[in-house]
Amino acid sequence: MYKCKFVLILFFITFPFFSYSNENATGIIKERMEKFQESKNLMRAINKNLSDSNFNVITQSAEKLNKWANEMHKFFPKGSEASSTNKSQASDDIWSNPEGFKKAIKTFEKASAKLIKISKNKNINDTASSFREVAASCKGCHQKFRN
């Protein structure tokens, strides 16, 4: 019985990763999806290291997020829209509202730059507040520009 429960739990934990994997994506779409996965991992690392007050990891992760913010626009050329075969979650609004998308990226870029600066002061409350701004910029963009 224990083995059966373990297998079921393992299946339900890993199944979402298979269903949303980028194995069908190629080229710029695959690269974009990998960059977003890396960004997600960096956000998790920052969140974890806030509780440990590990400002070096927080700053390094914020620097990587800021680098991604500055190059993100290059990963959304025309023709890289979402389709049923590439598993991209990019909304058509990215291409129909390019100014809005640029503004959302700029918000992320500014928030991540602020996090770099604030985390260097090693004040946990200010750093946590700045991290929430970065997270809000991600959420805001995803709500508007992700399917």
For the regions a language model picked out, list residue spans one by one:
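N-terminal signal peptide c-region/cleavage motif recognized by signal peptidases
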Residues: 14-18
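Bacterial N-terminal signal peptides that target proteins for export
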Residues: 1-7
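Boundary of Sec targeting at the N-terminus
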Residues: 20-23
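Sequence context surrounding c-type heme c attachment/ligation sites in exported
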Residues: 26-57, 63-147
